């Protein structure tokens, strides 16, 4: 989980008056998936709950919530240069993340609407919410004389492929962790109004309910997983070439059989929980630490609260969750943060590329070791963890 920069292949600016943020492995990603598998999903196991959630989406509770008021007038000018830079960076990352969700949900709703209309409608409603969030954030950026070119982002961002099952895990956690992040900030600023640096935060209470409903949708979708796929593709891709044969259907069925074994689900649950928690912790205690300080928040306390709550929430749908109360859990995450700081110092320090690489290797290996030990940490069985959920 280092913060080493991945060189961008396109140097064109993505907003007016501001160079694009450097892309790192901690940056928001744009995703694509197997649309054929998605359109063939069998929802019958949990269709009633999915229909109820879709009805909630139709009501669009926040239709009139994201309306700017007079508090925004002149608010940008009140920020000192350092806080301004931190806040604009927050806006850019948040807007990119919300827009990434919009693109994925919109494309899913369009590609599966003929064969899976209920699923398509749910994705369309979520795309509406994500677009609204991204637009509201982008409007706040315009208060600082900046604006993300979302059309440019759509055309020029690299897209990462995730199979549907991985999309479910990752997006469920993203939405639920988003809920806890937003509500924690809102409640903190409600008690400490002097730390509210911008009126955008007044909208976080209702905003986080969109995130929560999206997470509930993926919860319901994952509960329909025992018989997810009706008919599987007769295609297989090898080395960039696609081949078609009826026998390939059995290959896919065997692959999905393996993926649906109880042990497999437990391993994937641990993987995605750790990936999301470690990424957030490394980012927030590293490059985002000063931003949370500007809100009067201690980044470590804030992240540990969010991780603990998200872990509890995940126990409702994942078979196992992380043992976040084990004393080594946060100790190892802190070690990763410490390693990342050293890696950053090496990157910005003196020395040639070869010597820097040799100095970085031990820290990369240490990060890998910490993550492996965290993954191998005995998980908690969700059925035993459920009573702690409120």
Swiss-Prot record:
EC category name: oxidoreductase
Catalytic activity: Mg-protoporphyrin IX 13-monomethyl ester + 3 NADPH + 3 O2 + 2 H(+) = 3,8-divinyl protochlorophyllide a + 3 NADP(+) + 5 H2O
Domain of life: Bacteria
Keywords, sorted A to Z: Chlorophyll biosynthesis, Iron, Metal-binding, NADP, Oxidoreductase, Photosynthesis
Single biological process term from Gene Ontology: light-independent chlorophyll biosynthetic process
EC code(s) of this entry: 1.14.13.81
GO molecular function: iron ion binding; magnesium-protoporphyrin IX monomethyl ester (oxidative) cyclase activity
Pathway where this protein functions: Porphyrin-containing compound metabolism; chlorophyll biosynthesis (light-independent)
Region Disordered: start-end pairs: 1-20
Cofactor: Fe cation
PANTHER family for this protein: MAGNESIUM-PROTOPORPHYRIN IX MONOMETHYL ESTER [OXIDATIVE] CYCLASE, CHLOROPLASTIC
NCBIfam families found in the cross-reference section: AcsF (TIGR02029), PRK13654.1 (NF010172)
Family in the record: Belongs to the AcsF family.
Chain's role: Catalyzes the formation of the isocyclic ring in chlorophyll biosynthesis. Mediates the cyclase reaction, which results in the formation of divinylprotochlorophyllide (Pchlide) characteristic of all chlorophylls from magnesium-protoporphyrin IX 13-monomethyl ester (MgPMME).
Official protein name in the record: Magnesium-protoporphyrin IX monomethyl ester [oxidative] cyclase
Lineage: Bacteria, Bacillati, Cyanobacteriota, Cyanophyceae, Synechococcales
